[in-house]
Amino acid sequence: MWLIAPTTETVQSFFQGKDRTGRNPQVPILTASIVVAWIFAKSITNAANLGRSFGLMGGLAYAVYYMGIPICGLLIIRIRRTTGARSLVEYISWIYGSGAAKFFMAVILVRLYNEVWSNTAVVGSYFGQPGSQSFVLSSLVFTGLVLFYTLKGGLRASLVTDLIQFGLLLLAVLLTLLWVVPQAPGLSLAPMKSGFWNSGIDLLLVALIQCIPYAFHDPVLTDRAFLSGAKTTYRAYLLAGIIGASLIVLFSFVGMAARFVGGNAAVDAPVQAAAAGGAGILALMLCVMMLSGGSTLDSTFSSTSKAVVLDLKVGWQPVLTGRISMIAMAILGNLPMLLGTNILKATTVSGTMILGLAPIFLSLSREQRPQGAFFAPVGLSVVLGAVSAIKPDLLPWKIGSGENASLLAWNVVTIALVWVVFGLFVWQGKKSQNKMTRR
């Protein structure tokens, strides 16, 4: 990747992904970049684990998150056309004020931070147990290798290498399936437990609630919607959503195969399947994880540099400051590996916590709104999401009887409340504006 990644020194290439002639990214490279940036190493692992537990429904439930990609692309095109905003941070600053924009930036930076350790941890798990020397060392080496080529060209380097990684990822996933699935002739698409709610339907409903706000809190995805023209952007986002969802469903078959072949069910499904398949499948699985994790990491580093330099306006030498911010994120993002794996769960931003972004981006506006219309729903969802993770029993009822019955109930309550408080603040703002107009 070091040889393929271009070296750039201009703001247009380093932060906006333009080529040497000044052209914006076209459909093929933009589509490939979106797909591999959103097929995280952790996503592939989750897809396989859900396939092991819930069969085909598990894969479909996780694939629903990828519906957020084309919807996100379409909504950002509307933002660009109606307001002329050059980023989501700029849009929020115009409509809800600078305080709201800074809070949104904090959410983005936490997300980018989480992307580092959540992907390096998956790669490290193929070299040793969490917390072991081999686990930590492999995670750090992997981070360093990705950082090395991303420093050369920023977003342009990320886009170019993503195209190569996309082709290799497709090949690796197909070879993995061709190797694993035939070893499980009795593979079942059904869930492990019988019953409607045990089929994973509750998880699918949670994904439907979360898919749009989840997409909008990921700068790796949203940044790319500002790089090219409207037609190119929507075509790329539509194709990426279809391809990404398809890959997730396909990889859930690895989990179904892992359930059939048996082995240590306490480990992640890809590791379980790899252990049963021998050295060959282990090497293939490691390739899949390194390709998906690497593409996400380089996108994370380039989005970090853009957030620091263009959104926060830090530094006087943009490209140099961008490179320094990448190095800082690489170091900080791997601290959980050095401090112990328990901190990973404590720092994860759950999908419930960002449900407050749903009304912000589904109810677009050209006019200024009260800051409370941003802080109330977003703050409420952060609080409820944290409570649901720490004390899920505080909500006295559940929806259904499946494993995710409590999670579904928390999400239904949270999404309803954030829309209510958002509507109240918007209504109050219009009411106050009308009074001032009459005077």
Segment roles from a protein language model:
Residues 1-44, 150-156, 166, 172, ...:
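Membrane-interface "cap" regions at the ends of multi-pass membrane proteins
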Residues 17-84, 209, 221, 226-263, ...:
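Membrane-interface helix-loop-helix modules in multi-pass membrane proteins
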Residues 24-35, 67-68, 97-111, 142, ...:
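Select transmembrane alpha-helical segments in multipass membrane proteins
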Residues 60-150, 210, 289-299, 317-319:
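Helix-loop-helix module between adjacent transmembrane segments
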Residues 98-102, 306-345, 350-351:
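Loop-to-transmembrane helix boundary motifs in multi-pass membrane proteins
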Residues 2-8, 113-116, 120, 124, ...:
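Hydrophobic alpha-helical segments and their helix-loop junctions in multi-pass secondary transporters
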Residues 85-93, 153-162, 217-246, 263-271, ...:
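Hydrophobic, small-residue-rich membrane helices and short re-entrant helix-turn-helix hairpins
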Residues 1-3, 373-439:
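A generic transmembrane alpha-helix motif of multi-pass inner-membrane proteins
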